[in-house]
Amino acid sequence: MPNKHMPRILVTGACGQIGSELTLTLRERYGDQNVVAAGHKTKPSPTLRDSGPFEFIDVTQRETAERVVREYEIDTIYHMAAILSAVGEKKPHLAWDVNLNGLYNILELARQYRLTQVFCPSSMAVFGPKTPRNDTPQETILQPTTMYGITRS
């Protein structure tokens, strides 16, 4: 049974490299039933699937994420879902749709349902290839050269 005093967390992109580790870590911290993993097409690993709730959603279709927010009484979202560079360069419209329209849908849900927190990570890809990788200055100008970098800026 979910604990009402703990955050109720949704992790989009939970089947990805970072999302899967984040989900498992959040489940350890907040309890398995308080963290809902969500993916689109990729089947979850047995560890991810068996350690707590899992839902298939499409962030470009707001109603699929909205159903999960309502059903699980979500108050925090970690929005990890994204189309990465390899696919994004071949399918730029898909990258735009998932990475920007998907983010918009998540932010609108957060506004509508008055969620406590939304985390939307960026990427080193937003800086472009000429930016120093270590100790990147705070005032560095963003010069992304990939669809992924552009849509994560």
Please place each PLM-identified region on the residue numbering:
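Glycine-rich NAD(P)-binding loop of the Rossmann-fold in SDR/ketoreductase-type enzymes
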Residues: T60, K90, L94-N105, L142, ...
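SDR active-site strand-loop-helix element
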Residues: T12, A38, I77-I83, V118-M124
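Conserved glycine-rich Rossmann-like NAD(P)H-binding loop of the short-chain dehydrogenase/reductase
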Residues: Y30-K43
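Conserved Rossmann-fold NAD(P)-dependent oxidoreductase catalytic core, especially the SDR/UDP-sugar
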Residues: Y104-M147
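A hydrophobic alpha-helix adjacent to the NAD(P)-binding/active-site core of NAD(P)-dependent oxidoreductases
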Residues: F54, A95-V98, A110, V118
